[in-house]
């Protein structure tokens, strides 16, 4: 046998075997399933929970602790991000349907105002006393800012906090049985657990699109996650809910984590005190420009026009007397 002639053939044969995977065994890593007892429910029962709870909850005011995380892409780096976390911010939150929100954060320790944001269906205003800035803008973002928190809008908070009713005139809801990842209460390792998912399809004109996906835990039949989509099918809000409590027939979570993957920020709200359905006046959602503050109109940067407190952003930017 000519050793030098057969060696390349052997090497080639081994190479082909390696490429075809004959010498390797691949397997999927399957996480164990939770052994928690699971409850059964039909789609009508889950949809009724969403609609009934939404109808009962018309407004609330709350003491809240904020935890804000910002993820910003490093300059010149496509896969590297700078992450900043702002913790220990307490404050207040006022919410009134259909789309009124007031969000106040306090300076840790001092408890003076760190930020104050008011918004409705037409636009928002944001006061930042520590920087003497007053920011106004519309709710629509035509050109995202490279500063993630400049993309924060009240509807992102409002829609995540309150599970909207499923409108039978414009929406269709279907049930899917799926699985979710949960933590083992003993060792905190990831486990798979069966869940229910209500998929909401919305119709506008001749077009239907995926609007929301609401996940229910089968341990307690309460929602623990909601995905909200845009018209392009992107997830724009990923909200998770923990520790629901019953407030005289209104179910509301103790902690809400709101992730906005497109804009690159997330906000966790932990509620320490909640009061539901007490009257909240219109002026509680009005935020006027303080004298001497520099006004920043985000819509002049983005090219669209805002309406804030019944005024356009241009009108709101005029000096107050």
PLM region descriptions:
Residues 23-25, 175-292, 296-300:
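Gly/Pro-enriched, hydrophobic low-complexity segments
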Residues 44, 128-212:
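Flexible, processing/modification-adjacent segments and terminal tails
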Residues 51-60, 84-87, 94-99, 117, ...:
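Edge/loop elements at the starts and ends of beta-strands within beta-rich repeat scaffolds
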Residues 63-72, 106, 199-203, 228-229:
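Generic short beta-strand segments
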Residues 24, 96-159, 293:
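An acidic-aromatic
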